[in-house]
């Protein structure tokens, strides 16, 4: 087993457990015949976390060339996976009696879940800071034309979601975040390639 496979076995386990929490929570509602009570905010939050986990899984392959088995390289992905697991574990209630009050359940736990997602984004930014400097130095147009606006949009939506109070605002922000993460990962490299060609690289 090579170094990346050894790392990915542990990393994938944590991410897999996070997916299990999401699917298990949804399956619990199906078993309790409570699917009609599934609130839009909860459904979108679960979908967002699922998309984030899938995107993180895709990103893991970009790390395969230079991964080393030490805390210097592993702290970021392990923290990232841990934050996603904690967020996923809280999305759906474990008590069937709470299915009838999903709106209240969402409101009571929204800041914790979104806080975990913001923490994951902060870890991702910190881990990629050298890459940001490299892009700024060698591809400034791409850096200012895509990387910065894209990340500002994501971070802005997360912060707005953390402080949002209305149901409509929550739904709009969750939908926007899902689209923001789906677009560049739908076909890896397509958006980056378009931006690079736009700026003449």
What kind of feature is each model-predicted range?
Residues 1-18:
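Hydrophobic transmembrane alpha-helical segments in integral membrane proteins
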Residues 8, 12, 71-82, 141-154:
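Alpha-helical transmembrane segments of polytopic membrane proteins
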Residues 28-41, 64-69, 97-107, 160-173:
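Membrane-interface helix-boundary motifs at transmembrane edges
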Residues 40-63:
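A generic, lipid-embedded transmembrane alpha helix
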Residues 44, 170-182:
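Central hydrophobic cores of alpha-helical transmembrane segments
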Residues 61-89:
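Alpha-helical transmembrane-segment detector that highlights a single hydrophobic TM helix
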Residues 81-150:
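Membrane-proximal helix-loop-helix units in multi-pass membrane proteins
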Residues 133, 183-201:
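Juxtamembrane boundary at the C-terminal end of a transmembrane helix
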